[in-house]
Amino acid sequence: DELGLAFDKTVNERLKGVSRERSFEIILEVNGAQETFLSEDKAKFIDKKNEYYKALIKQVTSKDILPGVMDFLNESKKQGILLAVASASKNARTVLEGLGILSMFDYVADASKIRYTKPDPEVFIDCMEHLKLQPWECIAFEDAAAGIEAIQAANIAAVGIGASVKPAVPDVFLDNTEELSIEKIENLLYK
């Protein structure tokens, strides 16, 4: 708002799964304003945007967990499935803590632990290595096209959730998190 740059739901969907810097570049591209800001100014605005974001995520609670996610996590833990989070955000742990589900995950890989962000597969490879798993032993879930590309580059089965995974083509597509179920995903992947 304060920069006079257009930002709507469509733009927001493009920002999923990419770094802070790339997010700002996308916003500038959409507005035809790539040349408007000096590098120092870009860095200031990226920091300011992150401060707004950090203030917002401090308000996250268990009420913000998407439908179907808690049942899926509980079902996974009950079956002894190792769970990891592969996030492009440095704030992943804070969000998981706010949601009250951090303890459900065996590992959290985020932008503070990796050099390259999605669509590079590094964050997924980091999760596999930490959990001592091979790609064929993993299934990864994503709500962003860059994430689907990263999963596939790591040779992991990709489950895309929601329309924002397009134009990427996951191995399994779910309309929303309410469709999450181990049985359903196994049936779709291994039919």
Where do the PLM segments sit?
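Residue-level marker of alpha-helix boundaries and capping positions
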Residues: K63, L83, E137-I139
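Residue-level detector of anion-binding/catalytic polar loops
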Residues: A6, L82, A157
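Short, intrinsically disordered/low-complexity patches at protein termini
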Residues: N31-G32, V60, L82, I148, ...
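N-terminal helical cap/lid subdomain that shapes the substrate entry/recognition surface
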Residues: D1-M70, E75-Q79, T94
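Asp-based, Mg2+/Mn2+-dependent phosphohydrolase catalytic module
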Residues: M70-K77, K90-K191
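Conserved phosphate-coupling serine/threonine residues in phosphotransfer and NTP-handling enzymes
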Residues: S87
